[in-house]
Amino acid sequence: MFKFFKNKQDNKKIERKIEFKEKLNSLEENVVFKIENLSLWYKKGEKQALKNVSANIAKNHVTALIGPSGCGKSTFLRELNRMNDTIEGVLTDGNIFFEGKNIKSKKLPVTFLRTRVGMVFQKPTPFPISIYDNIAYGPRSNGIHNKKVLDKIVENALKSAALWEEVKNNLKDLGTSLSGGQQQRLCIARAIAIEPHVLLMDEPTSALDPIATAKVEELILKLKDRYSIVIVTHSMSQAQRISDDTLFFYAGEIVEANKTKEIFLRPQLKRTRDYINGRIG
């Protein structure tokens, strides 16, 4: 009788362990970036921009990075595709895992990362070449030269960026001839033409008018079904409109991280409440 009871208890323990492991695996599968104790210094250690930052970025979510100017959010964003490597005198510590691979490892070529993590900047940056060639540039760089294949990639990318109907008859026109909002959508189309897994966006609507901003926001909400999106924004209302999760940065640290609704409706910390209510900036 005692042996039967003990075996039953052991079986329950095993079941609980299996259940816990399955939940853990499920959580890991839903994380595209895992950041552990990340610190960064400029000027060979003279100025610290990030201080022991840890966070998870969820797959197929829009994650907003908010905080006052100079708090480290853009530096953090650039670290996710190692763009800070191009700045002289930058020192880093900590780990960043992208889909399970440590991107801080010298064994991982930066080209692996750049083909999987696209970037859209604050100011639209179309190349001074045709609309078609703007989109085809990335695929060509990756070895695709068949015209029929390129035509399809260009069309699909422009459709995904909600720009195809506006430019399909003018693909030979310069990308720089488009309006500001169209240029930004062209840059988004260019980023997704290489079929990345993640889109990083550094204040992508700050230079746009309200109508163009609304179109880009609508596009972001559609794109998250296919991509994980991380966006830096100074607009509290924009973060609430388009993001699922929010990381609040202050003085190089993540002060609070949570679902966006929780951050804005039920912030846990006074500093978060003060920032959201405009008492600090």
UniProtKB/Swiss-Prot annotation:
SUPFAM superfamilies: P-loop containing nucleoside triphosphate hydrolases. Keywords: ATP-binding, Cell membrane, Membrane, Nucleotide-binding, Phosphate transport, Translocase, Transport. It catalyses: phosphate(out) + ATP + H2O = ADP + 2 phosphate(in) + H(+). Residues 33-276 form the ABC transporter domain. One of its GO terms (cellular component) is plasma membrane. It holds the Pfam family ABC_tran. It is a peripheral membrane protein. It is an enzyme of class 7 (translocase). Its EC number is 7.3.2.1. GO terms for biological process: phosphate ion transmembrane transport. Its main location: membrane. One of its GO terms (molecular function) is ATP hydrolysis activity. ATP binds at G67, P68, S69, G70, C71, G72, K73, S74. The keyword Hydrolase does not apply. It is found in: Cell membrane. PANTHER family: ABC TRANSPORTER I FAMILY MEMBER 17. Belongs to the ABC transporter superfamily. Phosphate importer (TC 3.A.1.7) family. Part of the ABC transporter complex PstSACB involved in phosphate import. Responsible for energy coupling to the transport system. NCBIfam families: 3a0107s01c2. The complex is composed of two ATP-binding proteins (PstB), two transmembrane proteins (PstC and PstA) and a solute-binding protein (PstS). This is Phosphate import ATP-binding protein PstB. It comes from Mycoplasma mobile (strain ATCC 43663 / 163K / NCTC 11711) (Mesomycoplasma mobile). The lineage of its organism: Bacteria, Bacillati, Mycoplasmatota, Mycoplasmoidales, Metamycoplasmataceae.
